[in-house]
């Protein structure tokens, strides 16, 4: 079952169940203290509650008549790094000074985890993601993203775009926060696939296409079977000595990295598709500022 925050043509924001061709409105007034998407996600039974809240009196809305919004309320966004072999190699190549650190963290018990964004820095479907004006080498990182309740339970999954300034991080690993965390540095959406049973990781494909002036300039594909970390372990490390009272999204690393000679340009378009969830597309903006 998939849930989303959408805006129909009348401009209101509603929570819906997402089908292939349409969406069904959820009537949150049926349950006390249920006002936002996160209230459903953080309930004891998100799937059961969602099914109960589907409004039988509301006609389904064609999917092309709604605008999908970022599926985030007040949660934090965190990210894990170097969880795929391809990412390990790329990070070692970009940073001579920190190459050995990236090599070691790939196999270490403790993963790399960093704070990525708050809700104000997140872009939803169709909204711009940003390249820092002081970066000459930036890429999108398509990531399977966990949705975690305040109790540390995995309640769903979505698509994440971890915008990254590779030259800034490569210059010095201590610059990681500046390479990762800035305005419009993350994309999330279009919906949340509620957690129901075990995922077929090999069948959960992740694809990314980057277009420039209407033409594809990069394509890549991987699947969750290539990931070296388990979701439960990442959540355990995230929540160790670290409460998440408003819940969290956790990007789980990338297995798709464009070649070293590639960088994003202003006006590019990034499309990420994950099987079972959907497609997230964001235009890219890079502005010029006087030094």
Each model region followed by its residue ranges:
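Catalytic-pocket segment enriched in acidic/His residues
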Residues: 9, 164-291
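Generic N-terminal segment detector
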Residues: 1-80, 233, 282-291
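Short tryptophan-centered beta-strand motifs in secreted/extracellular beta-sheet-rich domains
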Residues: 3, 144, 272
């Amino acid at each position: 079952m998939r849930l989303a925050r959408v805006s129909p043509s009348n401009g209101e924001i509603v929570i819906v169940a997402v089908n292939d061709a349409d969406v069904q409105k959820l009537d949150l007034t049926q349950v006390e203290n249920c006002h936002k998407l996160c209230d459903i996600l953080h309930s004891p039974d998100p799937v059961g509650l969602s099914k109960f809240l589907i409004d039988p009196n509301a006609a389904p809305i064609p999917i092309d008549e709604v605008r999908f919004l970022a599926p985030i309320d007040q949660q934090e966004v965190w990210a894990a790094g170097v969880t795929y072999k391809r990412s390990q190699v790329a990070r070692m190549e970009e940073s001579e000074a920190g190459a050995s650190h990236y090599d070691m963290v790939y196999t270490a018990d403790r993963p790399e985890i960093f704070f990525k964004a708050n809700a104000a820095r997140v872009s939803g479907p169709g909204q711009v993601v940003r390249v820092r004006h002081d970066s000459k080498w930036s890429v999108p990182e398509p990531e399977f993203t966990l949705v975690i309740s305040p109790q540390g339970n995995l309640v769903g999954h979505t698509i994440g775009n971890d915008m990254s300034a590779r030259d800034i991080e490569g210059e010095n690993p201590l610059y990681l926060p500046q390479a990762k965390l800035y305005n419009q540095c993350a994309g999330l959406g279009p919906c949340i696939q509620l957690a129901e049973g075990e995922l077929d990781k090999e069948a959960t494909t992740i694809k990314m296409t980057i277009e420039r002036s209407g033409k594809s300039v990069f394509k890549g594909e991987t699947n969750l079977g290539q990931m070296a970390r388990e979701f439960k372990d990442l959540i355990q490390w995230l929540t160790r000595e670290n409460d998440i009272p408003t819940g969290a999204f956790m990007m789980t690393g990338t297995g798709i990295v464009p070649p070293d000679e590639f960088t994003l340009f202003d006006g590019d378009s990034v499309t990420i598709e994950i099987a079972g969830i959907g497609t997230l597309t964001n235009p890219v903006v890079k502005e010029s500022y006087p030094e």
